[in-house]
Amino acid sequence: MKYSPSLETIKAYAESGAYKILPVSCELLADLCTPIEALRRLKQVSTHCYLLESVAEREKWGRYTFLGFDPKLDITCSGRNMKIGDVRIKTEHPAQQLRQILAEYKSPRLPELPPFTGGLVGYFSYDFLKYAEPSVDLETRDTENFKDVDLMLFDKVIAFDHFRQ
C-alpha cells in the first residue's frame, strides 16, 4: 500500500496555512474490480454516488475513472432559493455562493495524485443562465421542475488509473 503525498509534504502544507484541505491518497491494486463493480458496491453503502470518466479530446478511452460517494454537502438552487446543507438562503447570485464554497474547500494540485481529488459534482440547468446573464430574458415555462443547480461536494473519491492497471 502506497500513501501520497509524503508526511513531510503534508506537514509543509499544514504549516504554510495556505489550504484547509489536503488530498491524501492510498494506492491499492484493483486487478479484479472494475469501476462498474466498485460503483455497484458503493451504492450499497451510500445513497449518493457518481461515476465520471476522464476522456480527453479525441481520445477513445480516458486515463481515469472517478467514483465518489457519501457527499459532504448537498447544494441546490431553484428560483433564487438556495439550500447549502441544512441552511436555506435567498440569493440573486448563486454563483457567488458557489465560489465561496469552492474557496473554503480549495486544495493544492499535487502532481503525484490524479487531477480530480474531490469537489463539486452535479449539474447547472439551462435556466441557470438567468443568474449568469440577467440580460437574457428566459421566458420559458419550467414544466419539468428541474433545479437550477443541483450539486454535491464529494471529498471521498476513488480513482481508477487505467494506464497503471
Residue spans of the language-model regions?
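Signature of the chorismate-utilizing enzyme
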Residues: 1-165
